[in-house]
Amino acid sequence: MKIKDIHIQNFRGIEDIKILDADPQMNLIVGVNGAGKTSILDAMAILLSWLIARMRSTNAKGASINEADIKIGSKEPCLLSIETEKWVNWTVSKSKSYTIRNKQTSSKTDLKEMQNLAEEIVENAERGGGVPVLMYYPVERIVASVPVNLHKAETNIWDVYKDALSGNSNFRSFFEWYRSQEDIENEMIRDDASYRDHSLNAVRKVISSFFPDFSEMRVRRRPYQAMVIKKGEEVIEFSQLSQGEKCYLSLVCDIARRLAIANPDLDNPLDGEGIILIDEVDLHLHPKWQMEIANKLTSI
């Protein structure tokens, strides 16, 4: 699934902007502070949230445009529109209307084509196929300290959309999932020493590709429970990595995790499809990594 066109009108500080014929692999939005980069990503997240909602229920609603999102001073409605590479388009809008006594707002959506797309995705998943990953990593994404006691995470294909577009990315769910999958893998290895979990292999492949010096990420049980990773020849706790290392590593591993959840039918889940939105992709990164990350992300 790929985005072809985006049209945004009267959304926050944006009066009218169109992104036409977007690159199918990678699009970088560059601008000075206050230019509207985050607003563009937030608008796209609102639009994609309706697709996720309609996968769950035919009458479900996605994120709404708040009255505060309508451009100040505009008498025209706020309009967000998206078109995919398969010519499927949908629109979410909100306008201000006035009465004599008070001000009211009205909303309008055009979701007919998107509803059909949502139903196709659900039907494909029910036949054992995969679903597209839709994910937004906002600038507020954080790497919370890895909890000492991780809870087992029961996973199904629709968990790929948990907190996907809400802006609440703290990566805790990644560590819980990794612990759960590693437990399953360890149980299988007792019967078959050559067994490796294909979803964990997807994460390991990403780590080796992005971080050649990193390997063997695992949950250490003794002397106390902690997520550890081998950096060079030294095994260190995840919490001891630099903020840039933690942020970068968690980002690419979480993308790989979601691809694995979304594509249980693929031998290589990294061949799955989706739309990933990342605000300030170079956040906390060393200048060398800042120069590399955009190109490397296209390899996932």
Where are these regions (language model features)?
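Switch/communication elements of ASCE P-loop NTPase nucleotide-binding domains
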Residues: 1-59, 224-300
